[in-house]
Structures are given as C-alpha cells and as structure tokens.
Amino acid sequence: LQKITGFIWTYAITNPGVNALRTPVYAEMVNIVNDKPVEFSKYKFDADTIRSMFDNFSFNNARPITKAMIAWWAYQNDKQPLLSLETTFEIEHIYARNRNEKENSLTDARNVESLGNKALLEKRINIRASDYRFTDKKKYYEGFTNSKGQVKEGTGVVELLDLTATSADFTENDIIDRYKKMIDCFINYLQKNSLIK
C-alpha cells in the first residue's frame, strides 16, 4: 500500500492525468492478482527530477493531492495520534494569506501557497484562526477558555502544537525550511519503497 500510494502521488505530479496512471498501475495490479511483488520496475523516479517537479508544482487547495500530502506529512511525526474520521479537516495556511495581503511581507508571494505553509487543521478551528498572525493563532491551535467560560478545544495536529511551543512566529524562512523537510522526507519515503532509480 505504501509503495502504490507513493507511486501514485509522485506520478500524478510528474505525469498529470488519470490516463497517464493507467499503464503503470494496471501492470502492477495484475502482479497483485498473480501473487507477484509490486515493483514499478519500469517506472522508477529520479530524485532530482522529483524535487524539480515538486518545486514547480502548484499545490493549490483545490487539488486533492495537496490535502493528501499534508495529511501524510502530519503522520510522519511519530507523536501524531490517529485523528477522528468524523472530524472535518481543512487546509490551514500557517502564515495567513490575509497577513501577506495586508503586510506584503513575503519576498516571494508564492510562498504563501507553498506546501511548506500548509497543514491540516480542524474546520472548527480554521474558521476562527484563518486570518490571524501566528502569535494570535497559537491560542486557537492550543485551545483556550473564552470570557464566557466556554472551553475551545485545540487542534489534534501535533506538528502545529509543537510549532506553538517552540516558535514565536512563523516566517518566510520557516515556510521554505518546512517545505524542504517535507520534500526530503517524501523522497526518502520513495527511496524506502524502492521507487527511486
């Protein structure tokens, strides 16, 4: 399952379109039926090409691969417990889009839509936290009790909780560094699943 998932996600970026996936995936499904190993031996990826393709890919929120990648990333943290399937998750911009529009503080405005700036966040929290600076978002990520004594539960996404505990702000450099860690980790994942040449 990990090998097929890694292959499909990578192939969807390097060779977009459902039709492009049919040939390699069908051959491996035949191998499964015939009780042979799934190897994708004719379709191994080059790590540098993957990195370049990911760097040039637009991970916009309308693409299912965006949410899939950030969900995968959340579970690369060994401390991340399983999140409830009943919870609705949205894509959180850690460095708020609205903040960039108001402050014009990113040297490259495209970084606001970088995979390194996105995380899963429960919809009930994202509605309240979406337009704030990171220092203000921390309260919503961690949870709090409001002036009426109502407890507002925080996120179950461990990475966001770790960020609130260790970072005073989330800057453009943090976006770039986090993106690099994500891609390095994904390429390592492909390597572990024998999908790299």
Please describe what each predicted stretch is.
Residues 21-25, 29, 93, 156-160:
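Extended alpha-helical interface modules used as scaffolds for assembling large macromolecular complexes
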Residues 3, 7-11, 28, 32, ...:
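Generic, well-ordered alpha-helical scaffold segments in large soluble proteins
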Residues 64-90:
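Short cysteine-rich loop/turn motifs with clustered Cys
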Residues 82-114:
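Histidine-centered nuclease catalytic patch
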Residues 1-65:
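A cross-family structural signal marking well-folded subdomains
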Residues 1, 10-21, 38, 79, ...:
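Intrinsically disordered or highly flexible coil/loop and linker segments, enriched in small
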Residues 56, 111-114, 118-197:
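Long, cytosolic, alpha-helical-rich C-terminal regions that act as interaction/scaffolding modules
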Residues 1, 22, 43, 62-63, ...:
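Active-site-proximal structural scaffolding
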